[in-house]
C-alpha cells in the first residue's frame, strides 16, 4: 500500500510557505515552534494536536517551491504536504479574503506544443492539463469548513497584474485563482506519491495595491483554517 492509499492518521506534515507574511501567521498559532537547521533550509518544527509539522519558507516561484517540497519529503518523511497562503482572484464568484481549497492546478507556463502539439500546460504523465489534488484531504477540510469553495488554480512564475493576463487564464484554462508555487508543489508530490493539500485565501483581484493591503489579513484567515484542519487529520 502506498502513502496515497493510507487511511491512517497523518503524524508528520510538511508545510511549504512562500513569503514572510504567510509564515508569521502560522508560527503564531502552533502549539510549539522550534528552529531546525537542515541542509540549506532554516526549517521550523511545529506542533498541532498530536501532529509534528515541519515548515519552510521557500520564497516565491515554482522551482523554489518544488525544491522545498522534495526537501520536506526527503529530510523529514512528510506524509502529507500542505501549501497554504494567499492568491490572486480570477473569478466573479470570489472576493478578497475568501478562502478556497485547490481542486486542480494548471501550470500555464509549461508549453511543449512546438514539438509535440500538446495543449499548453499538458504534462505527458497526467491525463489533463488540470492536475488534481487529493480529494480525501479536500473533503476533510470542507466537512469542517463548508464555506470554503473548491477552485482551479493557474500557477506560474509571474505575478498576474495585467487585465490581459487575467483574461487569458480564465479563457484558456477556466482558472479561478492564480499564484506562483502550486504547480511545483503538486508535481513534486505526485512524483513521490505523497498527498498534497493546497489552501489559499484571496489577497487581491490581481492588483499589486490590493495585495499589499490585504496580504496579512488573508494569511491570518487561511492559517486559522489550516491549523484546525491539521488537528483533525
Regions found by a protein language model. Give the residues of each.
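A C-terminal functional module that forms or caps the active site or interfaces directly
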Residues: 158-208
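Mid-sequence, gly/pro-rich, charge-dense loop/helix-turn segments that line enzyme active sites
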Residues: 89-173
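Short, Lys/Arg-enriched N-terminal segments with co-localized hydrophobic residues
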Residues: 1-9
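Alpha-helix C-terminal capping segments
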Residues: 71-75, 93-94, 186-195
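Regulatory input/activation interfaces that engage signals or partners
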Residues: 194-196, 201-233
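N-terminal short beta-loop-beta anion/metal-coordinating cradle
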Residues: 10-70
Amino acid at each position: 500500500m502506498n502513502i496515497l492509499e493510507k487511511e491512517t492518521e497523518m503524524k508528520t506534515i510538511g508545510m511549504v510557505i512562500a513569503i514572510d507574511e504567510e509564515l508569521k501567521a502560522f508560527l503564531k498559532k502552533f502549539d510549539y515552534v522550534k528552529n531546525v537547521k537542515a541542509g540549506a533550509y532554516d526549517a521550523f518544527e511545529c506542533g498541532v494536536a498530536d501532529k509534528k509539522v515541519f515548515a519552510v519558507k521557500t520564497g516565491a516561484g515554482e522551482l523554489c517551491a518544488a525544491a522545498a517540497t522534495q526537501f520536506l519529503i526527503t529530510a523529514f518523511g512528510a506524509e502529507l504536504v500542505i501549501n497554504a497562503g494567499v492568491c490572486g482572484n480570477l473569478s466573479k464568484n470570489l472576493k478578497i479574503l475568501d478562502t478556497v481549497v485547490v481542486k486542480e492546478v494548471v501550470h500555464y507556463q509549461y508549453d511543449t506544443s512546438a514539438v509535440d502539439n500538446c495543449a499548453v500546460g499538458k504534462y505527458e504523465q497526467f491525463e489533463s492539463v488540470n492536475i488534481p489534488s487529493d480529494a480525501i484531504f479536500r473533503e476533510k477540510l470542507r466537512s469542517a469548513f463548508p464555506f470554503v469553495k473548491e477552485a482551479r488554480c493557474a500557477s506560474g512564475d509571474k505575478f498576474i497584474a495585467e487585465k490581459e493576463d487575467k483574461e487569458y487564464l480564465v479563457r484558456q484554462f477556466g482558472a479561478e485563482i492564480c499564484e506562483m508555487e502550486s504547480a511545483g508543489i503538486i508535481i513534486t508530490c505526485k512524483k513521490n506519491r505523497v498527498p498534497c493539500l493546497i489552501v489559499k485565501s484571496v489577497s487581491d483581484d490581481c492588483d499589486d495595491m490590493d495585495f499589499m493591503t490585504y496580504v496579512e489579513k488573508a494569511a491570518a484567515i487561511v492559517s486559522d483554517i489550516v491549523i484546525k484542519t491539521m488537528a483533525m487529520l
